[in-house]
Amino acid sequence: MKNTKNLVFGIGNPLIDLVIPATDDDLVKLGINKGTMALVDQERQKEIIDYFKTIKPQFYPGGSAPNTIIACAGLGIDSYVAGKIGQDDFGDIYLDRINKFGVN
């Protein structure tokens, strides 16, 4: 019997996206170009987080393969992702979020 069940398996780099509401003035002060993404080192990350220290960020799973898998899960496709996840708060947040999106 032929297996007709659809599933998707992705391998990628799990990341955590921190989402913070910012004004155009905030972006100018921080030297950030609107509508872009940039990986930053720990020093730059601390600088940006310190600037927004009074605003609680929202955390979302990121990375191109994991984002694709999350989208597939949202379409009702059995979806799985593999990647190295740290044993820290961000790793816990990541696992919690992808499970809520229905990813295995």
Regions found by a protein language model. Name each.
Residues 97-104:
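A glycine-rich helix N-cap at a beta->alpha junction
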Residues 84-85, 97:
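"Short basic amphipathic alpha-helical interaction patches in structured regions
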Residues 1-82, 89-93:
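Glycine-rich phosphate/adenosyl-contacting loop at the front of the ribokinase-like
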